[in-house]
């Protein structure tokens, strides 16, 4: 508003009314109902979070080696930072509520002005001017789509505006009191983030905008929300109102900076897909076990060091990604996930896979690369549905004999371990198509004699071991199309044959065995005169004994 017009002389009612409306139009757009609710809920959230942080700070105890004054300085700094952070988090919410308060106040002013115009004037005349229409507010955008995907944005088109208070709604034509022909300036809905109206480089969602989005999504019964890499770096936690999204089936919050999830996440009762990869989550709330319809859960690339016991309740879960965390163990409850088809726990600190893994009776793919495994449980043989097993870069010395029961196994990768041998029982897993036992270095000196049973094998990697001789049954691997044997002291077949490719090796082994068999048939051992004499004496004795009988 132009401050120079504040002392402008107004000689008529029309001028006063126009000035009132000019001042009113100068206000920023009024926040929507959902925004106001979100702001109030956000402030409550922050207050609870602050209280929890302050209580945690108060519980900290000083070590005997730390000076009391120094420890007190640290405590006060932590408290000061919590207060500073909370002010930053609610700054937008407070500003929004202040704006709503001003609009409410101006509503009263407009109503009073309308009453003055409608009532007899001070000079005894009655104004012929109609009452002033009330201020309007923004309304939630009515959208036929049931998903909000911030990766695919479309322009927001203004819809009909509605009043915050229905008693103020006027359906008459705009009054001619306004020079522009409108009762109030058109306002674009504020509930959605600017990324919905701009290009791919739109600014990211702040806490208040996220809270507003949740409110409007809850009322619209939104089914899908994609906020991948769409939250500001300062946004480390999610508002409790997240639990209102009971109709949500898919939620993508990946590639943000989330540290903690609210307990109310259990309220997402319809959720089937939850993607939280590439955040900084250190612990999961027990309420995650209430997501009973969850089918897909991606928690990769976080900072998890444990899993809640409630995990066992996710019996519909089919895909679970726990890769790139700090997990030292997998809980026994993992065996309760009877619908699980794909489990990825690579790049953790896991030393042992629990025996209960045998309860994952639907498991098709298990990846546990880059851990500290020393062995695989015998129960692995119970998972007859398993097709892919990858345990690269571990400390495994031997494979369980029960692997012969893996009737569906197609791919096995145990490279970069400490394997001393491959059990003969593995050769009963005749469905194997890919086998990688390379890079076990000095520990691996031979292949199982019955490796030829793996007639479906197409890829075999035995590189960087100490294997000198291939077994005779190798000739049966007629489907082999990839064979890596470099950095082995191979004697049979010779290195030049191995370099010609897998079929050359198979043919060489076949020719070698046939030649050896042919020689063994041609060479018949001759009896010595001692053997002949002994044989004839023996026969004579047998014959005479038969005659006596």
Swiss-Prot record:
LRR repeats lie at residues 245-268, 269-291, 293-313, 314-337, 339-360, 362-383, 384-406, 407-430, 432-454, 455-476, 478-500. Transmembrane segments: none annotated. Residues 154-167 have a biased composition (Basic and acidic residues). One of its GO terms (cellular component) is plasma membrane. The modification Phosphoserine is found at residue 167. A motif (GVYW) lies at residues 501-508. Residues 141-150 have a biased composition (Polar residues). Widely expressed. It comes from the Eukaryota. Residues 119-167 are annotated as: Disordered. Residues 119-140 have a biased composition (Low complexity). Keywords: Leucine-rich repeat, Phosphoprotein, Repeat. Leucine-rich repeat protein that likely mediates protein interactions, possibly in the context of signal transduction. Belongs to the SHOC2 family. This is Plant intracellular Ras-group-related LRR protein 4. It comes from Arabidopsis thaliana. The gene is PIRL4.
